[in-house]
A protein has these predicted regions:
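Mid-domain Rossmann-like dinucleotide-binding core that forms the NAD(H)/NADP(H) cofactor-binding site
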Residues: 1-30
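Short, well-ordered coil/turn elements that cap or connect secondary structure elements
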Residues: 4, 20, 78, 101-103, ...
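Surface-exposed, flexible loop/turn segments at secondary-structure boundaries
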Residues: 15, 91, 116
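C-terminal substrate-binding/catalytic core of Rossmann-like NAD(P)-dependent dehydrogenases/reductases
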Residues: 37-40, 44-45, 94-143
Length: 170
């Protein structure tokens, strides 16, 4: 859990999120005010401290709306809030009301190729991940498909916890 005291996971497949053993979940199939309320409820009494955002777009806007509440709960105990953007699967842009920036100690950061750690550290991480995979501690359920089936199976990963592997004939 990377030293986190409370972890909230957001996604469309709640069964997968709940299996992670997190403290709270947010259903990203919700929209508008319902999604904002879900993020507010999931924050708990300490609010959010670090947010790792893989999708950007409407879900991020809903989360940010919970920070625009003009009370001390959004200060994460005086430590501030860090929003780390890792991807933009839902949308490339968001609307960011200026009031969100003025009403709390929010830092917005990006994590991409320009933010990679030094090569020796990356090698250590890769070694640790491969060791976990070799012992079976890191598993991913997969389903194999022929390249000819790609049009039919393209969206399967959106509806299932099983990852598709496309077989390419040699």
């Amino acid at each position: 859990q990377a030293g986190a005291g409370r972890i909230v996971a957001a996604g469309r497949r709640l069964s997968v999120l709940e299996a992670l053993g997190v403290d709270a979940t947010v259903d990203l199939s919700l929209q508008g005010e319902a999604l904002t309320q879900a993020f507010a409820a999931a924050a708990g009494p300490g609010g959010y401290q670090v947010i790792v955002d893989y999708i950007w777009g409407p879900a991020t806007e809903a989360l940010l709306a919970t920070l625009n509440n003009h009370d001390l709960s959004s200060y994460a105990g005086g430590r501030g809030i860090r929003l780390v953007n890792v991807g933009s699967m839902a949308a490339p842009d968001i609307r960011l009301p200026a009031a969100v920036l003025r009403s709390n100690q929010l830092q917005i950061l990006g994590s991409g190729t320009g933010n990679f750690p030094p090569i020796p550290e990356m090698q250590r991480y890769a070694t640790e991940i491969l060791a976990l995979a070799a012992t079976g501690a890191l598993t991913i359920e997969t389903q194999e498909h022929a390249l000819a089936e790609i049009a039919e199976v393209w969206d399967l990963n959106k509806k299932s916890d099983v990852r598709s592997v496309i077989r390419i004939a040699r």
